[in-house]
């Protein structure tokens, strides 16, 4: 059965990678879900601000797990680049806020027909403009729960971690209640 690719942006990666190990490139569930990042996420993680807040990202376990990317054919790369240019132009003229990497994730999502996991509200708006599939970190956790890839104890622990570091996604309370019924 072919994989169901799901792209994970920087904020979702940072919220999950420490608790669900390994996070990336591990198929799970009947639909063979598999999480991927883009190479540009590794570049973002070199920022001093992120390095000081998330020093664990340089540990071998996490760096090694971030070496797997979606396989992209040459023709797809060209289409992704063209789509990126169009999306990035829209960001610069109509919807300031998303980064170049955010726009690139949207371009990949459109070409691959894969959802992007993000809690970034600007990126979510951009995805909606281009009708790219997007899901929140909580929605991904629900898929993982339903697939037996995680359990509620782990999810509650992740949420406690977010609360401790004051890193709660937008609309968290309502979304958590809607998704998990707690």
Say what each PLM segment does:
Residues 98, 105-140:
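Acidic, metal-binding active-site segment of PIN/NYN-like and related structure-specific nucleases
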Residues 2-112, 121, 156-161, 170-182:
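Active-site-proximal, substrate-binding regions of enzyme catalytic domains
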